From Swiss-Prot:
Residue spans of biased composition, Low complexity class: 151-161
Phosphothreonine: residues bearing it: 74, 191
Expression (tissue specificity): Testis, spleen, heart, kidney, liver, lung, brain and CFU-E erythroid precursor cells.
Major localization class: cytoplasm
Family: Belongs to the CENP-U/AME1 family.
Protein name per UniProt: Centromere protein U
Coiled-coil parts of chain: 291-352
């Protein structure tokens, strides 16, 4: 803790002065009266070492002290001044809030290395060591920082690696700068702002993304272990397709390959690829089954249509063959119809004629007997009676004619 520190300021690199000139310039600046406070301010606390800086009693009364950087690029100061500067910078950092916590550790270390460097030159004057009270306070602060960083490191180790790294959560001030500041703090300088900062460091928890993503990966691994294996044993050989064989072989290959992979991120990527590929194959299988069913229905419909078409052709041929028969039957029907009508008419005529004869006979029986007289009106009746006589005469003539021919031949 007794080592010397040096602050580097941007000055004119061409100007060169001796160390004695620098020290005399610095003593004149210290003895000068108070000036308006510039941007670069060193706030000296009450616990600073009085022997390291002349006129300590006068400086305690002054609230601020001006400081003009020398022309030389570096200047040597006591460790007490450096501690006071660190205390003021830490109080400013607490007022800034989250902006100082989001800094990258590499950037903080680089800025710390540029602003604060250990001086390797020979000391010009002796410095008194820091009191034991400041050492004890520094140890307490270190212990608090270590206790705040312990659970964070354990939580980071316990969280499994996600496929895509989540956003980096807001980190507190880097350990190196914190140790440097806390080593110089005293019990009086430990403000409520620093205490609240330490409490917030203890209460920091990993972001929600880090807590949710490992659970999702865990469920994926559990789901992959309890996944459904595509089985071909219960199917008939005619129902098994190329996609069924590909899917079963793909699942077996996936399980064998997954047992050989140890990386969690690789397992998650393999699981995603497997589930997407399996879903695509199952979708293709369902579409193939639907296509097969539609083809079977289509073939059945086509077969029924062919049967009906063949039957239609047969009926047309039969109709063509039976058409002349239909015409013949139609003519026969017409003839029979005419005969039926003629028979009805003849029957009606005969019935009327019979009735007439009956009436005539009845009249003759009732009337007086006398010679019959025939006139022209009775000609039809005479012809009807002579019909039998004329028929016998014609019959005798035919017999006579035939006998004459036979005699001529003899």
């Amino acid at each position: 803790m007794a080592a010397r520190r040096s602050l580097r300021y941007s000055g004119n690199p061409g100007a060169k002065h001796s160390k004695n000139t620098l020290r005399s310039t610095y003593s004149r600046k210290q003895k000068a009266g108070p000036k308006p406070r510039p941007k670069d301010v060193f706030d000296f606390s009450n616990n600073s070492d009085a022997s390291s800086i002349p006129g300590a009693l006068e400086e305690e009364e002054e609230t601020y002290e001006t400081f003009d950087p020398p022309l030389h690029s570096t200047a040597i100061y006591a460790e007490d001044e450096l501690s006071k500067h660190c205390v003021s910078s830490s109080s400013l950092a607490t007022h800034r809030g989250k902006a100082s916590r989001n800094l990258d550790p590499s950037e903080d270390e680089a800025s710390g290395n540029e602003s604060i460097k250990v001086s390797t030159k020979k000391p010009r004057r002796k410095l008194e060591p820091i009191s034991g009270e400041s050492d004890s306070s520094a140890d307490d602060v270190r212990r608090r920082v270590a206790s705040a960083e312990g659970p964070r490191s354990q939580q980071r180790q316990a969280a499994p690696a996600a496929p895509s790294p989540p956003e980096r959560p807001a980190e507190p001030v880097t350990p190196r700068r914190t140790r440097l500041h806390s080593a110089q703090l005293s019990p009086v300088d430990e403000t409520p702002a620093t205490q609240s900062q330490l409490k917030t460091q203890k209460k920091v928890r990993p972001s929600p993304g880090r807590r949710k993503r490992p659970r999702r990966g865990h469920t994926d691994t559990d789901g992959s272990e309890s996944m459904h294996i595509w089985c071909l044993e219960g199917k008939r050989q005619s129902d098994i397709t190329e996609l069924d064989v590909i899917l079963s072989v793909f699942e077996k290959t996936f399980l064998e390959y997954k047992q050989r992979v140890e990386s969690e991120s690789c397992n998650q990527a393999i699981n995603k690829f497997y589930f997407k590929m399996k879903g695509e194959l199952i979708r293709m299988l369902k579409e193939a089954q639907m296509l097969k069913a539609l083809k079977m229905k289509n073939t059945k419909i086509i077969a029924n249509m062919e049967k009906k078409r063949q039957r239609l052709i047969e009926v047309q041929d039969e109709l063509i063959r039976l058409e002349p028969q239909l015409k013949q039957l139609q003519t026969k029907y017409d003839d029979l119809k005419e005969r039926k009508s003629s028979l009805k008419k003849s029957k009606h005529f005969l019935s009327n004629l019979k009735q007439l004869c009956q009436d005539y006979s009845n009249v003759q029986e009732k009337g007086p007997k006398g010679t019959g007289k025939y006139d022209s009106s009775s000609l039809p009746a005479l012809l009807f009676k002579a019909r039998s006589i004329l028929g016998a005469e014609n019959h005798l003539r035919t017999i006579n004619y035939q006998l004459g021919k036979l005699l001529e031949l003899d």
